[in-house]
A protein has these predicted regions:
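Phosphate-binding/switch loop-helix module in NTP-utilizing enzymes
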Residues: 51-122
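Generic anion/oxyanion-binding catalytic loop in active/binding sites
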Residues: 8, 88, 139
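Conserved catalytic-core segment of NTP-binding enzymes
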Residues: 3-4, 95-174
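Short flexible/disordered coil segments
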Residues: 46-49, 73-77, 140-144, 173-174
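N-terminal phosphate/diphosphate-binding loop that engages ATP/GTP or pyrophosphate donors
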Residues: 3-74
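Conserved protein kinase catalytic core
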Residues: 18-20, 86, 123-125
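Hydrophobic/aromatic beta-strand patches that form the interior of the parallel beta-sheet core
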Residues: 9-11, 77-79, 137, 166-168
Length: 174
């Protein structure tokens, strides 16, 4: 898409963030990217949440974040959102609100190509993080559990209005 002159955002939401390597970013470039979820000051600024305040904005300003905090390589702008990193760390609601709003802004309010690398499983579907997507590509491995997860992803994605759910197999011998 980038070669066609379209604006492309690649958003890494997987806790095992390695989308940048797959897209040709160097390790040095990736080390210079701070995941949005680790930007405490930005999250406090935008959501109004801090340790002394249990209330926060559920619709923070995020439209400038992809350009400001993303890193570009070969016409693709990478944004690393990050995830929860410590057990028992308390509520991460403000961080989750920010991440959902950033994805929502990219998908629903722009005419760009957006590719999300999400964590395997169903949690992001339950949170509605992927609402507004046109298509899902679900990677499965051989085995009944993986196929069952695909069926659940397909059902939940359809409930969110995703038009196409495709499947790609991995680790299969033909």
């Amino acid at each position: 898409y980038a070669e066609e002159g379209k604006k492309v955002f690649a958003v890494d939401v997987d806790p095992d963030a390695n989308l940048g390597l797959a897209l040709g970013f160097s390790e040095e470039e990736l080390e210079s990217i701070t995941p949005i979820s680790k930007m405490r000051r930005l999250i406090e600024e935008r959501t109004g949440a801090d340790k002394s305040n249990t209330f926060y904005k559920v619709n923070p300003k995020v439209d400038d974040i992809p350009e400001t905090y993303g890193k570009e390589n070969n016409g693709v702008r990478l944004l690393v959102l990050g995830t929860v990193e410590t057990a028992g760390g308390g509520c991460v609601c403000p961080e989750n609100v920010m991440l959902k709003r950033i994805i929502n802004n990219l998908v629903l309010h722009r005419d760009d190509i957006v590719i999300l690398d999400m964590e395997a499983g169903l949690e992001h579907l339950g949170r509605g993080t992927t609402e507004g997507m046109d298509q899902f590509i679900v990677v499965i491995e051989p085995g009944a559990r993986s196929v069952q997860t695909y069926k659940n992803v397909k059902r939940l994605a359809e409930e969110l209005g995703v038009k196409e759910v495709k499947v790609k197999s991995s680790r299969c011998i033909s």
